[in-house]
Amino acid sequence: MYPAHLLVLLAVCVSLLGASAIPPLPLNLVQFTYLIQCANKGSRPSYHYADYGCYCGAGGSGTPVDELDRCCKVHDDCYGEAEKMGCYPKLTMYNYYCGTEGPYCNTKTDCQRYVCACDLQAAKCFARSPYNNKNYNIDTSKRCK
């Protein structure tokens, strides 16, 4: 084997080892975004829910600041239950439809059904809960104890 080929092979192996340490992106986040948009037709963009209160977005702690934030806590808890069932809610892809009455799930496996139900429940909760701009991008270290 030529030294240049060996170097290329070594570089590929090292890069693959490094890539294995990178956590996968949550694949169903796009689906959840579409469910939110379907349930909240003509409402605010779904990214407004990504950094709201103590529970909307990554992580969560303390007492939810309002009804909308409680929706996110319930969603987090629902994902926790899915994990206890052996599901991977952030990676589970499912089938859903956006009908005239709003979104609904149409999936085959137990994990798909459960995760879709979690997302659907949250999207509908977002639709009926008031959005308070004061709770967007809050200082969670002070308000989420």
Curated annotation (Swiss-Prot):
<dbReference type="GO" id="GO:0005576">
    <property type="term" value="C:extracellular region"/>
</dbReference>
<feature type="active site">
    <location>
        <position position="75"/>
    </location>
</feature>
<feature type="disulfide bond">
    <location>
        <begin position="54"/>
        <end position="144"/>
    </location>
</feature>
<feature type="disulfide bond">
    <location>
        <begin position="105"/>
        <end position="116"/>
    </location>
</feature>
<feature type="binding site">
    <location>
        <position position="57"/>
    </location>
    <ligand>
        <name>Ca(2+)</name>
    </ligand>
</feature>
<keyword id="KW-0443">Lipid metabolism</keyword>
<dbReference type="InterPro" id="IPR033113">
    <property type="entry name" value="PLipase_A2_His_AS"/>
</dbReference>
<feature type="active site">
    <location>
        <position position="119"/>
    </location>
</feature>
<dbReference type="GO" id="GO:0050482">
    <property type="term" value="P:arachidonate secretion"/>
</dbReference>
<feature type="binding site">
    <location>
        <position position="76"/>
    </location>
    <ligand>
        <name>Ca(2+)</name>
    </ligand>
</feature>
<comment type="similarity">
    <text>Belongs to the phospholipase A2 family. Group I subfamily. D49 sub-subfamily.</text>
</comment>
<feature type="signal peptide">
    <location>
        <begin position="1"/>
        <end position="21"/>
    </location>
</feature>
<dbReference type="InterPro" id="IPR036444">
    <property type="entry name" value="PLipase_A2_dom_sf"/>
</dbReference>
<dbReference type="GO" id="GO:0016042">
    <property type="term" value="P:lipid catabolic process"/>
</dbReference>
<feature type="disulfide bond">
    <location>
        <begin position="56"/>
        <end position="72"/>
    </location>
</feature>
<protein>
    <recommendedName>
        <fullName>Basic phospholipase A2 cPm08</fullName>
        <ecNumber>3.1.1.4</ecNumber>
    </recommendedName>
</protein>
<dbReference type="GO" id="GO:0005543">
    <property type="term" value="F:phospholipid binding"/>
</dbReference>
<comment type="function">
    <text>PLA2 catalyzes the calcium-dependent hydrolysis of the 2-acyl groups in 3-sn-phosphoglycerides.</text>
</comment>
<feature type="disulfide bond">
    <location>
        <begin position="38"/>
        <end position="98"/>
    </location>
</feature>
<keyword id="KW-0964">Secreted</keyword>
<keyword id="KW-1015">Disulfide bond</keyword>
<feature type="disulfide bond">
    <location>
        <begin position="87"/>
        <end position="111"/>
    </location>
</feature>
<feature type="propeptide">
    <location>
        <begin position="22"/>
        <end position="27"/>
    </location>
</feature>
<feature type="binding site">
    <location>
        <position position="59"/>
    </location>
    <ligand>
        <name>Ca(2+)</name>
    </ligand>
</feature>
<keyword id="KW-0378">Hydrolase</keyword>
<keyword id="KW-0732">Signal</keyword>
<keyword id="KW-0106">Calcium</keyword>
<dbReference type="GO" id="GO:0006644">
    <property type="term" value="P:phospholipid metabolic process"/>
</dbReference>
<keyword id="KW-0479">Metal-binding</keyword>
<dbReference type="InterPro" id="IPR016090">
    <property type="entry name" value="PLipase_A2_dom"/>
</dbReference>
<dbReference type="InterPro" id="IPR033112">
    <property type="entry name" value="PLipase_A2_Asp_AS"/>
</dbReference>
<dbReference type="GO" id="GO:0005509">
    <property type="term" value="F:calcium ion binding"/>
</dbReference>
<dbReference type="GO" id="GO:0047498">
    <property type="term" value="F:calcium-dependent phospholipase A2 activity"/>
</dbReference>
<feature type="disulfide bond">
    <location>
        <begin position="78"/>
        <end position="118"/>
    </location>
</feature>
<keyword id="KW-0442">Lipid degradation</keyword>
<feature type="binding site">
    <location>
        <position position="55"/>
    </location>
    <ligand>
        <name>Ca(2+)</name>
    </ligand>
</feature>
<feature type="disulfide bond">
    <location>
        <begin position="71"/>
        <end position="125"/>
    </location>
</feature>
<dbReference type="InterPro" id="IPR001211">
    <property type="entry name" value="PLipase_A2"/>
</dbReference>
<dbReference type="Pfam" id="PF00068">
    <property type="entry name" value="Phospholip_A2_1"/>
</dbReference>
